[in-house]
Amino acid sequence: MGVFNRLRSFYEARIAPTVASFLSRISPDPNIYTLASPVAAAAALPAWLYISPVASLLLIALSLLLDAVDGAVARFTGRVSPLGSFLDSSLDRISDSLYHATLYIAGVHPLIVIAMLSGGLIVPYLRAKGESLGLEVRGRGLMERGERSIAILAILAISIYNLQTALALASAAAVLVWITVIQRMVYIAGELRR
C-alpha cells in the first residue's frame, strides 16, 4: 500500500467522520459539495489570469477538499446514492480537466498538458472498467487521482517562481501517469487471463 493510500485510510477512519459531522450541519446534502468542487476548479482559471496565481492555487485546493469531503458527508448522513456516485465520478473528470487547463494557462507546454490529461482520464476509466469486470483496481499504479492532484498543485506553485522547473516536473508527472496506465492495463489483462 502506497503512502497516499495509507493517508487516505487514515483520513477515512479518523478525519472524515469529524469533518462530515461539521459539514453536515452546513448542508446535509453531499451533492452540494460534489457540485461545488468543479465550480471552484473553474474559478481557478480566471483567478490565475486576473487575480493572482496564489488565489488560483487556493481555489484548486478548495476544489480538491470539497471532492474529498462529499463522500464522507454522504456516509455520515446516510445519503450514499447511485446518483451521488455518478455525479462524483463525472464531475471529478470535469475538475481534472479544469486543473489541467490551469496548467496550460500557467505556461506548461500544451503537449505536456495533453499527455498528463489524457493519461489522467484513462487511469480512472481503467479502474471503472476493471471494477465492472469484478476486479479491485484501486491502489494499482503510481499516479492515482490524489497523487496527480498533488503533482498539479506542486507544478502550479513552482511555475510561479520557475517555469523551467515546473515544465520538468510536469514532464515527469506525464510519464508517471502513463506508467500508471500501463500498470493498470497489465494488471487487468493479467487478472482476466486467469
UniProtKB/Swiss-Prot annotation:
Active site residues according to the UniProt entry: 92
Catalytic activity: CDP-2,3-bis-O-(phytanyl)-sn-glycerol + 1D-myo-inositol 3-phosphate = saturated 1-archaetidyl-1D-myo-inositol 3-phosphate + CMP + H(+)
Domain of life: Archaea
Cofactor, free-text remark: Binds 2 Mg(2+) or Mn(2+) ions per subunit.
Membrane topology qualifier: Multi-pass membrane protein
Keyword tags: Cell membrane, Lipid biosynthesis, Lipid metabolism, Magnesium, Manganese, Membrane, Metal-binding, Phospholipid metabolism, Transferase, Transmembrane, Transmembrane helix
Record pathway: Lipid metabolism; phospholipid metabolism
Binding site for Mg(2+) 2: 67, 88, 92
Cofactor dependence: Mn(2+); Mg(2+)
Main location: membrane
Transmembrane annotation, as ranges: 32-51, 58-78, 103-123, 150-170, 172-192
GO BP terms in the entry: phospholipid biosynthetic process
A Pfam family per the record: CDP-OH_P_transf
GO MF term (any one): magnesium ion binding
Annotated positions binding Mg(2+) 1: 67, 70, 88
Location(s), subcellular: Cell membrane
Cellular component annotations (GO), alphabetically ordered: plasma membrane
InterPro entries: AIP_synthase, archin_ph_syn, CDP-OH_P_trans, CDP-OH_PTrfase_TM_dom, CDP_ALCOHOL_P_TRANSF_CS
Cross-referenced HAMAP family: AIP_synthase
Stated family: Belongs to the CDP-alcohol phosphatidyltransferase class-I family.
Its job: Catalyzes the formation of archaetidylinositol phosphate (AIP) from CDP-archaeol (CDP-ArOH or CDP-2,3-bis-(O-phytanyl)-sn-glycerol) and 1L-myo-inositol 1-phosphate (IP or 1D-myo-inositol 3-phosphate). AIP is a precursor of archaetidyl-myo-inositol (AI), an ether-type inositol phospholipid ubiquitously distributed in archaea membranes and essential for glycolipid biosynthesis in archaea.
Name the record gives this protein: Archaetidylinositol phosphate synthase
Protein's organism: Aeropyrum pernix (strain ATCC 700893 / DSM 11879 / JCM 9820 / NBRC 100138 / K1)
